[in-house]
């Protein structure tokens, strides 16, 4: 459908910012839909940019959802990771303005549609590791599964944790690390952060059609999914994750974007909806799906409190990416949410 209509069913295409040529200026890499080459724009330092995509060797034609610059081989320059359909592409920077696609990176094809990647040195060995989110098998055309049940689906493809061997080649450590726990969702995004201040990066995963994951780093190369215990499963339509200390108490709080729908709220809170979903718990799950975004305050004891409605940050329409940002320079973090989807000319009920 993407190629035929130009509509990306997995959301908008992302971009990455990084100084790929080491001149002290931030350059831009822009992901595109299938058939259009991705673009690398070199910053000239005077407010203008040059398109160096083809010269640099990163004009990928595959549908790309996101990219990240990171020094994955520890040679001092920024390499590039691109999430492209069912593949994760690693371009190694030669330090002279050109990239080479590494075919033997160790990334194994899963057949699933990949949506995003998060980077951190989870085992603190000095090498950056990758966590890769997968959504479904639409891009490959194989083993398509409709999310079942819709409000708490557990028939999605697995995500992957790749450990960096130190030379920008990777090994799949999903199972031995413990990240195979609850690893059957429809994942859109993940973000690393040390939420419990123990010095080890933890990981939150936003899943569509159901519960999210919070993988607490045990400090020995393994993780435990503590989302339920911490109070951040957030059973909804997870789209993105943002960490930030919104209340200035020195602890990282958690913002998760979902979907806000007035039509969905009207339908699911209608007494007649009980004829469709007789179980009260199921009805509550559908109602949560339409409530919108969530803000969880870090209590400092390994748990979080849902302060969404008190703070007033639930509304975001059909939300996608989100982030904390002090846009007015008052020393307090604000929240920015991108949103929107395909709709008709009548928008009053969105």
Predicted features and spans:
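Acidic, glycine/proline-rich Ca2+-coordinating loop motifs
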Residues: 1-350
């Amino acid at each position: 459908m993407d190629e035929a209509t130009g509509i990306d069913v997995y959301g908008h295409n992302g971009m990455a910012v990084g100084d790929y040529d080491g001149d002290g200026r931030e350059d831009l890499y822009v992901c595109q839909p299938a058939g259009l080459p991705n673009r690398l724009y070199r910053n000239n330092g005077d407010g203008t940019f040059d398109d160096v995509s083809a010269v640099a060797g990163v004009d990928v034609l595959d549908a790309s959802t996101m990219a990240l610059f990171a020094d994955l081989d520890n040679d001092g320059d920024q390499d590039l990771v691109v999430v492209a359909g069912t593949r994760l592409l690693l371009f190694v920077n030669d330090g002279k303005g050109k990239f080479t696609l590494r075919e033997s990176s160790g990334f194994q094809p899963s057949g699933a549609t990949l949506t995003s990647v998060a980077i951190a040195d989870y085992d603190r060995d000095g090498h950056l590791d990758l966590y890769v989110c997968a959504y479904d098998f639409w891009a490959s055309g194989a083993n398509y599964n409709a999310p079942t049940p819709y409000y708490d689906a557990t028939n999605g493809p697995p995500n992957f944790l790749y450990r960096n061997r130190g030379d920008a080649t990777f090994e799949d450590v999903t199972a031995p690390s413990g990240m195979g726990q609850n690893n059957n969702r429809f994942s859109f995004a993940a973000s690393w952060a040390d939420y419990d201040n123990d010095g080890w990066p933890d990981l939150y995963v936003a899943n569509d059609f159901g519960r999210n994951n919070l993988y607490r780093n045990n400090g020995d190369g393994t993780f435990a999914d503590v989302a339920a215990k911490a109070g951040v499963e957030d059973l909804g339509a997870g789209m993105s994750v943002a960490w930030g200390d919104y209340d200035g108490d020195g602890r990282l709080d958690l913002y998760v974007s979902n979907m806000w729908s007035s039509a969905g709220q009207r339908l699911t809170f209608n007494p007649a909806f009980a004829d469709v979903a007789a179980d009260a718990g199921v009805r509550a799950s559908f109602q949560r799906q339409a409530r919108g975004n969530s803000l969880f305050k870090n209590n400092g004891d390994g748990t979080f409190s849902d302060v969404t409605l008190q703070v007033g940050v639930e509304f975001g329409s059909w939300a996608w990416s989100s982030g904390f940002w002090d846009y007015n320079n008052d020393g307090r973090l604000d929240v920015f949410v991108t949103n929107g989807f395909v709709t008709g000319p009548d928008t009053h009920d969105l």
